[in-house]
Amino acid sequence: MKKAVEFHSEERGEMIRADLYTPDEGEGPWPVVIMGGGWCYVKELIMPEYAKFFLDRGVAALIFDYRHFGESDGMPRQHVDGWKQIADYRSAVDAVSYLDEFKGVLDPQRIGVWGISFSGGHVLAVGALDWRVKCVISQIPVIEGWYNAMRAHGSVGYRELTALVQEERERRYLTGEHRRLPHSGDPKKEVVMWPHPETRPVFEHIKATTAPNHEHESTIASVENVLLYNMRPYLPMLLDTPTLMIVAEGDDLTMWEREIPAFNEIVTTKKKLFVQGGSTHMTMYSDLSHLEVAAVQAADWLEEWLVAPYR
């Protein structure tokens, strides 16, 4: 069953809107996995496909729009701030834990977090900082935003990106207005955030079929936020939280050469690294058979830590 819900963020005037999916069989209170998307995602973008596998294991899914995106509040629109998004995950944990609306429906003692791509990094921080989170699933995560941007753009492309950021910073200071740049595209034709031409067609197809609220652009100011983004300091803080990391073999979008060392820095022995061969970063969205492989790994993890111990 799907139900639209809302809850306030850490800024009480800004509401976060979400879809709550509960299993069709059995009865609550259900364990729940909180799901947020990556760069410029909305809650309808691919996450419900993953959630189907979790529902089959008796785990509810709370899929939310970050502030500044989709149906949630927040200005300017299409503004990506990793730390605000991490705070929105924690506000979702607050809602599950404290709101009467969820009592008897969701079990606040059995909360997991799932993230993909940019949010695959977010959940590592959430798991490290929030003792209420009982397990983490980090899929194809961004670990260090600066490194990813430099590696993806190369030195010449990175010069063009940072020149645009500097130009925009002056303009924004003088006018107060935010301009945008494309989420992805062909860097030979325009400056984009993520210079991977294969990304745009996948997201355009998803927008046309299931996620009409998706806009394939972000504020230029978002670039500065991602350059400051670094999850490595939080990895040693994952002392006892069960953590699954799913990596696409050879991933050159979120850089598997950073993901695997990051996994090794996670302290808990309750951890698992799954390197998915034969898949790319984007086929985990565009190819349902590749999506299923990752989703089953995640569902197994949720069952192991949120379901099986409570039978």
Question: Which sequence ranges carry the predicted segments?
Answer:
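Short beta-strand/loop motif that positions the catalytic acidic residue
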Residues: L238, M245-V247
